[in-house]
A protein has these predicted regions:
Chain A
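Class I SAM-binding transferase module
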Residues: 1-314, 320, 328-341, 345, ...
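Conserved SAM/SAH-binding loop
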Residues: 348-349
């Protein structure tokens, strides 16, 4: 067995009370903790704001900043706000006391840690004022601590006098209220406390859609095994690994500072994570937004070609598809006499030509290849390849747009790779409709069919990224425009919750034998939410039949193994839509076609009516 | 009885089919109709888009524009789009045929009438594609014809095989879907068809909140009275008057062109409207948005002073209040010996001084008046009044801010008029807290208490106005910013539906005897929707006790008769909230106070969570 990789795991030791700051940091460090999580206010100092102006009381509620250097404050300490206050109390005095306490603490916490972490424990979903007081003008990260399962629910199992509202018992709703009131502020993240009880799988998946930044583990969820070691249950171990894989989150361990097993907890967590570590080949791309390519309108650059040519799977599948098509079209008896005409439309820097040559060689079929490419920069590469590497091959290079190409003969096989993350979004239908006239009546197109898929999803991280693209003269203004909120994006969506399974949207078949070709489409899809959640938009995928049973797919249920060329598509909604468990989600999707552009429009008609997004392609036209 | 006023009523004659355009216009004019409403497409010309390109069929589907002049097209004709098509059919061919038909007609209609009217009849709430096709890039007004009561509902009373969804039977939902999909486009308005059945009152009130531009009357809702005249039922007459008063709408009469009573219908409608006409003294202000004044921060100008001084009621009530206070403070036995000190804080151009002088004279009490005014321009007027008109009165003019004023003696009565539409929004609490130190221990403040009120409301017209304030480089962009959507406005709200009754929000008492004065406030209010509706924001009002039982109020249930100085306040929500009948609406309202400004924040927590509006007063601070 190979040595577990030295991945970086950051663990903070949570202290209920604190006597001596430097000693505590030293003690935690010796026990293999990177930092300590401490109450910001010192217990000894009671505060009374109503009777006493802040000025005189200010220096007395906590310790001095001079105890540590700025770097130590930032890296070694997570400040925790008082949780004994109630900003949402119906009693005005209690509420005002809470507001003043938290404002004072927040101000001091930001003084100490600048852009660092501040921890706030959430105790209910009645938190509008709390959200207002604690999130205004945040500079650092407000870690909102939420238990995975409401302690009252556990209680309710054996107590009948417990009073909690239905729905309000779900701690996700606490968090959802808080961050909705805070307008999905990117500075607000989750510190999710693992509880002894583990919720249903779908509830865990919903948490995976949230911006979880830390996992909180209490020493009391550790079990003692036969060897007297503290261990986590199998289920808790799996959770730990799952959250670390999704978020690369850090950990906060709640334990008594005198607990003899302090070192063990830290080492055990690291051990579990390291021994279950799997490198994600797409690491680094997580939830990063990209604008979909428009290879038809823009000429791709060398860097982009190179990235796509590196796909370990795609061109092998193309090669297999061409090989099978060649075998089907030319019986063994004719391999010496019959030459198949292959047209590669959109040759790029030659990967499909290479696939076609390999297919010909493997199937021992004779081929003549026409390579059509409109990008003059790619033509340079193709010419060089043909003149040097492929000079003994029967290849003709044509520098033109495939829609205007006038070949001297008709093709047996038309090969193209104009597929985008949503199938038709790089305009393969429009291109292939133009090129298919050069196909023999029995000729085949590779790919011969592509289908797009959609599902509604909760993706606050993506949503916040899009929102933050809005430029504003005044940083405090809230700006939402169609320019960003109605665009479409490509992203490796990791931190997202899929509200329902994908459904097919549009289908395109090549060659298209309809008497009048119309590539506009309109489809209504109906989904259902299993849990309360927030819908931020729709994830899009595609699959494509290259030839017979050879397909490529980024549909999550049928994803081609190793295929790396496409991330999912994301279609945002202008404003997040709060959805209740059991509610139906009805979405309309249009593919619109005009003389010089193609675009998608979308809106929802349930659970509530939305305006139509990307009207006339105002945010994102795809130029023909 | 006086002659009914010659109000302008515009009536169009709706023609099912049309043979000769000019004749028809002439015939209608002779029957006292201003215009005719005609099908845009000519029945003789069947259209088939799928088989035939538009170019060749284009000139054949309707009549030529040369038949009339542009002005005639605009003023004499309302074009009606085909209603035999179905843009939301599940059958792709039917849908595409519908799209092409309507696009062609719309294009031609806009060619004919430019910014004029185009009529479209709505037949169901399944209209996402219809809304998309007919509202994109609208230049004119799209009149969406909707029956007040669904004909199927009437049918269902005696047929059991009628199939319609529950909820979908409400034609308001058809309209609401349509305009929600069309993003509350200001170009889209309602042509409401009065049906024989009249819905419940609250449903009628909901329609009064919508942008109704025309009322459609079919000849078959006319009854024949004993004298063989066609008349409307009393209920229909009342509806007619109500809608005309609210909207000044025009009318479309559906009748057979050969109907002998054509002239009578037109004359009858005009007769009903004229004989029930009541001039609204506020006419011209309807639903116009104004930014609330900040008289503390900005110096009011002469025009504004003049407008407010014209209020026929306000200063009489002030005078009465001062008079009663004088009588209470100085018994008859002391009227020769005791002089009451009145301080008018915020003297403006003197109306309160005048009220105080009148009160003194009427009560025969002696007064000394200090007039405090910070606006140097108003000081000019006040000096002139004191030196000329009031030179024998005991009046001292002090040119300063009332919060800094240091008077030589303490006052019996402190009179001010710093009230805004939401009571405290012109900072009366802050001002009076500063001035009240000059009051004798038993002195009184006029006003002595003010209370603000709120209720949720549907006000698409106001909402659209606010939305259209957003400036955009590209007219097609959808832009929503806090700058406008989180501001507060003052408006004479006529075209609005009040979702629930107002409730009290904040209360301020003067003088404020709290040991520590805190003018920040936080209140949570709970409302309930009786009908499906859309919430665009909250209407705000106030009432104020001047002295004892003398009050001024703009609360709709207790509105002081004739009081004209204040319109309602409007607090918008960033995005309209679709509300279902029976749903609870929970809103939080904050009054926030900082060293140099005061502002309101608000959000809703039910039926769904909204972000907090006007955070830190980003859209609308009220400067101290």
């Amino acid at each position: 067995m190979s040595e577990p990789p030295q991945i970086k795991v950051s663990i903070s030791l949570h202290q209920d009370t604190l006597y001596e700051l430097e000693t505590a940091i030293e003690h935690a460090a010796k026990s293999n903790y990177n930092s300590i999580t401490i109450p910001l206010a010192h217990r000894r100092f009671e505060r009374e704001f109503v009777q006493e102006p802040l000025k005189t009381g200010h220096n007395r509620f906590t310790r001095s900043d001079l105890l540590l250097s700025s770097t130590q404050w930032l890296n070694r300490v997570i400040c925790r706000l008082s949780c004994g206050v109630d900003c949402d109390s119906e009693d005005d005095n209690v509420r005002k006391q809470g507001e003043s306490t938290l404002r004072q603490e927040l101000s001091y916490a930001e003084h100490l840690v600048q852009n660092g972490y501040i921890l706030l424990r959430l105790k209910s979903g009645n938190c509008a004022n709390l959200a207002r007081v604690t999130t205004v003008g945040l500079k650092g990260v407000l870690l909102v601590e939420v238990p995975m399962v409401n302690p009252k629910v556990a209680q309710a199992n054996w107590r009948s006098d417990a009073d909690y509202e239905c729905g309000a018992d779900d701690t996700w709703n606490w968090w959802n209220n808080f961050r909705s009131y805070a307008d999905f502020d990117t500075h607000v993240k989750v510190a999710l406390e693992f509880t002894a009880d583990i919720p249903e799988k779908r509830e865990i998946y919903r948490w995976l859609g949230e911006p979880v930044d830390a996992v909180v583990l209490s020493s009391n969820i550790f079990l003692t095994n036969a060897n007297n070691y503290a261990v986590l249950s199998k289920a808790h171990q799996e959770l730990l690994v799952l959250f670390y894989r999704t978020f690369g989150c850090h950990f906060i361990v709640k334990a008594n500072p005198d607990d003899k097993r302090l070192v063990h907890y830290a080492d055990y967590i690291k051990y579990i994570l390291r021994s279950n570590y799997k490198k994600d080949p797409m690491q680094g791309y997580d939830d990063l937004l990209e604008i979909p390519l428009q290879p038809l309108y823009d000429n791709l650059d060398s860097f982009t070609y190179e990235v796509f040519e590196k796909d370990p799977v795609k061109y092998i599948l193309y090669q297999n598809a061409i090989e099978e098509a060649l075998r089907d079209r030319v019986p063994s008896s004719e391999i010496q006499t019959r030459t198949s005409i292959i047209m590669v439309v959109g040759g790029g820097r030659g990967p499909l030509v290479r696939a076609a040559l390999n297919a010909a060689s493997k199937s021992k079929r004779m081929v003549k290849i026409y390579v059509v490419e409109k990008n003059p920069n790619a033509i340079v590469t193709l010419s060089a390849l043909i003149n040097e590497l492929w000079k003994d091959k029967n290849i003709e290079l044509i520098s033109t747009d495939m829609r205007e190409f006038e070949p001297p003969e008709k093709a047996d096989i038309l090969v193209s790779e104009l597929l985008g993350s949503f199938g038709d979004n790089e305009l393969s239908p429009e291109c292939l409709d133009g090129a298919q006239k050069h196909l023999k009546p029995d000729g085949v197109s590779i790919p011969c069919k592509s289908t797009s898929y959609l599902n509604p999803c909760m993706a606050p991280k993506i949503y916040s990224q899009i929102r933050s693209m809005e430029k504003s003269l005044h940083a405090k203004d809230r700006i939402v425009t169609s320019r960003y909120m109605e665009g479409t994006y490509v992203a490796y969506l990791k931190n997202a919750y899929h509200i329902d399974n994908p459904q097919a949207v549009f289908e395109f078949v090549h060659p298209n034998l309809d008497p009048i070709i119309d590539n506009s489409r309109y489809k209504t899809l109906r989904f259902k939410a299993q849990l309360d959640c927030v819908m931020h938009g729709f994830c899009g995928y595609f699959d494509s039949v290259l030839y017979k049973d050879i397909t490529i797919s980024i549909h999550p249920f049928t994803h081609t193994k190793g295929l790396a060329s496409w991330f999912s598509m994301f279609f945002p909604l202008t404003e997040p839509v709060q959805v209740r468990a059991g509610e139906e989600i009805v979405v309309n999707f249009w593919r619109c076609v005009a003389s010089h552009k193609v675009w998608y429009e979308w809106n929802i008609t349930a659970p509530r009516q939305s305006h139509i997004h990307n009207v006339q392609g105002r945010a994102q036209p795809i130029w023909k």
